């Protein structure tokens, strides 16, 4: 291109003096360089960083951000193709290979698909790409498995066999409110309103909501708090000094051990949440109210808890068909 500038200057030599020709050449070179700067293409890593920043601003939890990041990083490292050149065929092949190599369930692969789809949809919305390659890759069909809940008898067994006031209070609060274990361990004593039997929890994306507990839970919570000798503001703390805030893993381990000791199948915090939701729906609570209590943004998520109890089906059949 510099040769063309020289050619222009030479053609103007007949009408311009030396000083003017020199100035013309400077102006042409300057403007040419400014207007023809080649923009450096955005790297795949940079696209991912922009996406993660956007999700952070939207209020996604640290756990969700980490899952997005690890999922998409793995995909980009395996594909080794600039994002703008990634096609639907490439993505299908990646998902097939992922399932074969890891021998994972269809549910796991669909979770991966959903995360990657969110990434490309965001790129499309932000005009970084023309069309998401995930548009034609639909939800992977999985087997509909009816997940078990904790029976009334099992709940009473768990209560009766708690070795500490803390564990009894945890079981009552989980069963009564249906809160997530992550919400449980973040609770402070100050969050509990004993008069109204309610508390404020911070759910996914730090969304605040109000949940309610029964009289039995109120009694056991008070007994546990009154028995403590520490000054920690946390509602639930470790059993021994220095009495740190209880962690998610601590709750999970404690419940799992108690369940095994009683020969109960798969006792974990989320099972109490599922049980509470199922019981509420069975007793006639409107699904919209259950959604509010559980803190679901989509009612479809709540509908997954509307498990049809086979015993109830049998009773209804005997009632109407006998």
Question: Which ranges hold each PLM region?
Answer:
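C-terminal catalytic core of tyrosine-transesterase DNA break-rejoin enzymes
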Residues: 172, 176, 273-296
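DNA/chromatin major-groove-contacting recognition/catalytic segments
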Residues: 22-30, 211, 223, 307-322
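Active-site/catalytic core of tyrosine-dependent DNA strand-transfer enzymes
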Residues: 214-264
């Amino acid at each position: 291109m510099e040769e063309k500038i020289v050619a222009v200057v030479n053609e103007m030599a007949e009408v311009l003096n030396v000083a003017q020709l020199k100035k013309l050449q400077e102006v042409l070179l300057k403007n040419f360089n400014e207007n023809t700067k080649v923009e450096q293409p955005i790297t795949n890593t940079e696209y991912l960083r922009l996406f993660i920043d956007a999700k952070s601003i939207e209020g996604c939890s640290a756990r969700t951000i980490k899952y997005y990041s690890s999922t998409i990083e793995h995909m980009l490292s395996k594909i080794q193709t600039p994002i703008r050149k990634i096609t639907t065929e490439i993505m299908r092949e990646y998902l097939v290979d992922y399932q074969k190599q890891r021998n994972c369930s269809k549910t796991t692969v669909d979770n991966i698909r959903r995360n990657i789809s969110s990434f490309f949809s965001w790129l499309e919305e932000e005009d970084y790409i023309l069309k998401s390659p995930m548009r034609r890759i639909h939800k992977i069909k999985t087997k509909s498995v009816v997940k078990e809940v904790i029976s009334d008898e099992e709940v009473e067994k768990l209560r009766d066999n708690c070795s500490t006031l803390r564990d009894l209070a945890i079981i009552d609060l989980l069963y009564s409110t249906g809160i997530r274990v992550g919400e449980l361990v973040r609770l402070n004593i100050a969050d509990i309103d004993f008069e109204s039997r309610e508390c404020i929890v911070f759910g996914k994306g730090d969304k605040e909501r109000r949940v309610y507990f029964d009289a039995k839970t109120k009694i056991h919570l008070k007994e546990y708090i009154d028995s403590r000798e520490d000054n920690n503001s946390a509602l639930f703390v470790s059993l021994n000094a220095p009495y740190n805030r209880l962690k998610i893993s601590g709750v999970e381990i404690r419940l799992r051990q108690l369940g095994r000791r009683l020969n109960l199948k798969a006792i974990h915090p989320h099972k109490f949440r599922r049980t509470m939701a199922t019981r509420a729906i069975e007793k006639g609570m409107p699904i919209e109210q259950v959604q509010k209590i559980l803190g679901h943004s989509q009612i479809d998520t709540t509908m997954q808890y509307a498990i049809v109890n086979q015993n109830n089906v049998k009773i209804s059949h005997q009632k109407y068909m006998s």
